[in-house]
Amino acid sequence: MDIKSEVLKIIDELFMEDVSDMMDEDLFDAGVLDSMGTVELIVELENHFDITVPVSEFGRDDWNTANKIIEGITELRNA
């Protein structure tokens, strides 16, 4: 499974929301993510992809869409 599919599956499982048709929509504005959900998502992404997401790199505007989350995970895995 590729990173995109895995991230979409994690978001769907955590928040019971299929975001595959809203890849560039702000997930906070859409009600998918909130502050607690963000923490849950970070923990799940770190565990699943065996990465560490530095707090300095997880700003709301930096990871607020599915595409930005996928891009961030890809960059961290390639670092």
Curated annotation (Swiss-Prot):
Organism: Streptococcus mutans serotype c (strain ATCC 700610 / UA159)
Chain positions found as O-(pantetheine 4'-phosphoryl)serine: 35
Keyword annotations from UniProtKB, A to Z: Cell wall biogenesis/degradation, Cytoplasm, Phosphopantetheine, Phosphoprotein
Stated role: Carrier protein involved in the D-alanylation of lipoteichoic acid (LTA). The loading of thioester-linked D-alanine onto DltC is catalyzed by D-alanine--D-alanyl carrier protein ligase DltA. The DltC-carried D-alanyl group is further transferred to cell membrane phosphatidylglycerol (PG) by forming an ester bond, probably catalyzed by DltD. D-alanylation of LTA plays an important role in modulating the properties of the cell wall in Gram-positive bacteria, influencing the net charge of the cell wall.
Protein name: D-alanyl carrier protein
Compartments (UniProt record): Cytoplasm
Segments forming domain Carrier: 1-77
Main location: cytoplasm
GO cellular component entries: cytoplasm
Pathway in which the depicted protein is active: Cell wall biogenesis; lipoteichoic acid biosynthesis
Classification via SUPFAM superfamilies: ACP-like
